[in-house]
From Swiss-Prot:
SUPFAM superfamilies: S15/NS1 RNA-binding domain
GO cellular component, one term: cytosolic small ribosomal subunit
Keyword Coiled coil: no
PANTHER family noted in UniProt: RIBOSOMAL PROTEIN S15, BACTERIAL AND ORGANELLAR (PTHR23321), SMALL RIBOSOMAL SUBUNIT PROTEIN US15M (PTHR23321:SF26)
Subunit structure, interactors included: Part of the 30S ribosomal subunit. Forms a bridge to the 50S subunit in the 70S ribosome, contacting the 23S rRNA.
GO molecular function: rRNA binding; structural constituent of ribosome
Protein name as annotated: Small ribosomal subunit protein uS15
Top-level taxon of the source organism: Bacteria
Length: 89
Protein backbone atom coordinates (compact mmCIF):
# COMPACT_ATOMS: atom_id res chain seq x y z
CA UNK A 1 0.00 0.00 0.00
CA UNK A 2 2.97 2.34 0.00
CA UNK A 3 3.41 5.07 -2.57
CA UNK A 4 6.02 4.57 -5.24
CA UNK A 5 8.95 6.94 -5.58
CA UNK A 6 7.59 8.68 -8.69
CA UNK A 7 4.28 9.52 -7.04
CA UNK A 8 6.03 10.95 -3.99
CA UNK A 9 8.29 13.07 -6.20
CA UNK A 10 5.29 14.44 -8.13
CA UNK A 11 3.50 15.36 -4.92
CA UNK A 12 6.66 16.90 -3.48
CA UNK A 13 7.18 19.08 -6.56
CA UNK A 14 3.57 20.21 -6.51
CA UNK A 15 3.48 21.20 -2.82
CA UNK A 16 7.06 22.19 -1.95
CA UNK A 17 7.67 25.71 -0.68
CA UNK A 18 11.11 26.04 -2.30
CA UNK A 19 13.30 23.97 -4.61
CA UNK A 20 14.87 21.70 -1.98
CA UNK A 21 11.84 21.39 0.28
CA UNK A 22 10.98 17.74 0.92
CA UNK A 23 9.76 17.73 4.51
CA UNK A 24 7.60 20.77 5.14
CA UNK A 25 4.19 20.23 6.69
CA UNK A 26 2.57 20.97 3.31
CA UNK A 27 4.47 18.17 1.57
CA UNK A 28 3.95 15.71 4.42
CA UNK A 29 0.20 16.38 4.51
CA UNK A 30 -0.10 15.98 0.74
CA UNK A 31 1.77 12.65 0.80
CA UNK A 32 -0.34 11.41 3.72
CA UNK A 33 -3.50 12.43 1.87
CA UNK A 34 -2.49 10.42 -1.19
CA UNK A 35 -1.64 7.43 0.99
CA UNK A 36 -4.99 7.72 2.80
CA UNK A 37 -6.81 7.84 -0.53
CA UNK A 38 -5.08 4.64 -1.68
CA UNK A 39 -5.87 2.88 1.59
CA UNK A 40 -9.54 3.89 1.37
CA UNK A 41 -9.73 2.35 -2.11
CA UNK A 42 -8.07 -0.83 -0.83
CA UNK A 43 -10.55 -1.06 2.05
CA UNK A 44 -13.47 -0.77 -0.37
CA UNK A 45 -12.18 -3.91 -2.10
CA UNK A 46 -11.15 -5.68 1.13
CA UNK A 47 -13.46 -4.59 3.94
CA UNK A 48 -12.25 -7.28 6.36
CA UNK A 49 -8.61 -6.17 6.27
CA UNK A 50 -8.29 -4.95 9.86
CA UNK A 51 -4.56 -4.18 9.70
CA UNK A 52 -5.12 -1.76 6.83
CA UNK A 53 -8.04 -0.20 8.70
CA UNK A 54 -5.80 0.44 11.72
CA UNK A 55 -3.08 1.84 9.47
CA UNK A 56 -5.65 4.17 7.91
CA UNK A 57 -6.71 5.46 11.32
CA UNK A 58 -3.08 6.05 12.26
CA UNK A 59 -2.39 7.99 9.05
CA UNK A 60 -5.52 10.11 9.51
CA UNK A 61 -4.33 10.95 13.03
CA UNK A 62 -0.88 11.94 11.77
CA UNK A 63 -2.42 14.16 9.09
CA UNK A 64 -4.77 15.76 11.63
CA UNK A 65 -1.84 16.61 13.92
CA UNK A 66 0.13 18.13 11.04
CA UNK A 67 -2.92 20.14 9.95
CA UNK A 68 -3.38 21.45 13.50
CA UNK A 69 0.30 22.43 13.61
CA UNK A 70 0.07 24.22 10.26
CA UNK A 71 -3.12 26.01 11.32
CA UNK A 72 -1.47 27.26 14.52
CA UNK A 73 1.70 28.47 12.78
CA UNK A 74 0.47 29.79 9.42
CA UNK A 75 -3.29 30.01 8.96
CA UNK A 76 -3.08 31.33 5.40
CA UNK A 77 -0.96 28.36 4.23
CA UNK A 78 -3.35 26.04 6.07
CA UNK A 79 -6.41 27.42 4.28
CA UNK A 80 -4.62 27.32 0.93
CA UNK A 81 -3.55 23.69 1.45
CA UNK A 82 -7.04 22.61 2.53
CA UNK A 83 -8.44 24.11 -0.68
CA UNK A 84 -5.77 22.50 -2.89
CA UNK A 85 -6.30 19.05 -1.37
CA UNK A 86 -10.13 19.33 -1.25
CA UNK A 87 -10.24 18.49 2.46
CA UNK A 88 -13.11 19.36 4.78
CA UNK A 89 -12.41 21.61 7.75
Amino acid sequence: MSLDKGTKEEITKKFQLHEKDTGSADVQIAILTEHITELKEHLKRSPKDQNSRLALLKLVGQRRKLLEYLNSTDTERYKNLIARLNLRK
